[in-house]
């Protein structure tokens, strides 16, 4: 293993980067237009979409003979549209999961303020960290419903159904995971036709995917940083073809499964097929799509 060395590469401006790409064998039909793109899109960000076009060994940074800058921008645009598509679908899941957690917990505990009551949680340190975050969200909020609550009521925190509107999905999932009452958690998971462990795993995947979409990160050929659980039993259709659970296709399947429990007549399948049809030159294989995926029962619905 080589010893680490100091970083000594110099920063290069857009015009120099265009020349660098040309020297490495990338065809650029309109260098001035490519230069404009590189002035608005960080080269390091764009290089992720160049990587599939490199010859092996990729460390030599030589492009395949048919590689063109147009392909780079096509992959970039496809990834952007995929990101927006996934985010829009996840939004529906986020709202449904928040509602399920608040509904089941408030009904079971008979306490409107359970979210800020330590007695309902396993780990007191995690609870305190969450409480600090909740306090911060309430204090900084400019929402009219928060202003109304502060003006009208003497309680230090709003009830759970109001707090749920202020916090990110990741925090809501952490609150769920820290709940003491296992039966309540099982009931929440069953609302989405899942066993508790699978629900926990899949909600983590959905949260990580949502965060990638929010931060404009690459999702097209990115691998999951954790392995999602494979369900043994589901109440709705699930995939049967062998699929790589680390690839975005598996994430899309998880999203579709949740949507089928929330809105059985959803059109996610149609929208995904339309997106792929609009970018026929994008190879679905690096995303983990198996041959015949569109014939799965999961994707035949909607």
Predicted regions and their residues:
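Extended intrinsically disordered or low-complexity regions, especially N/C-terminal cytosolic tails and loops
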Residues: 1-208, 220-302
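Acidic/aromatic/glycine-rich contiguous surface patches that form carbohydrate-binding/processing clefts
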Residues: 216
């Amino acid at each position: 293993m080589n010893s680490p060395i100091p970083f000594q590469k110099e920063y290069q401006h857009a015009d120099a980067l265009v020349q660098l790409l040309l020297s490495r064998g990338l065809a650029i039909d309109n260098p001035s237009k490519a230069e404009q793109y590189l002035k608005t899109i960080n080269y390091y960000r764009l290089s992720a979409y160049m990587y599939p076009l490199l010859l092996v060994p990729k460390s030599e940074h030589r492009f395949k003979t048919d590689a063109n800058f147009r392909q780079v921008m096509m992959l970039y645009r496809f990834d952007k549209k995929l990101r927006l598509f996934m985010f829009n679908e996840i939004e529906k899941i986020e709202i449904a999961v928040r509602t399920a957690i608040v509904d089941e917990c408030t009904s079971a505990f008979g306490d409107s303020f359970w979210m800020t009551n330590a007695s309902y949680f396993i780990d007191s340190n995690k609870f305190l960290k969450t409480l600090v975050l909740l306090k911060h969200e309430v204090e900084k909020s400019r929402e009219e419903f928060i202003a109304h609550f502060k003006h009208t009521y003497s309680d230090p925190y709003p009830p759970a159904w109001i707090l749920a509107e202020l916090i990110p999905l990741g925090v809501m999932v952490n609150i769920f995971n820290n709940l003491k009452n296992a039966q309540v958690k099982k009931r929440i998971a069953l609302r989405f036709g899942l066993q508790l462990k699978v629900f926990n795993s899949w909600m983590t995947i959905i949260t990580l995917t949502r965060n990638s979409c929010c931060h404009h990160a690459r999702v097209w050929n990115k691998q999951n940083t954790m392995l999602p659980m494979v369900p043994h039993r589901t109440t709705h259709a699930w995939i049967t073809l062998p699929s790589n659970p680390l690839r975005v296709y598996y994430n899309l399947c998880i999203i579709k499964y949740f949507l089928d429990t929330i809105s059985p007549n959803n059109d996610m399948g149609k929208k995904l097929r339309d997106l792929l049809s609009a970018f026929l030159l994008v190879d679905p294989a690096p995303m983990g799509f198996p041959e015949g995926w569109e014939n799965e029962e999961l994707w035949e619905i909607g």
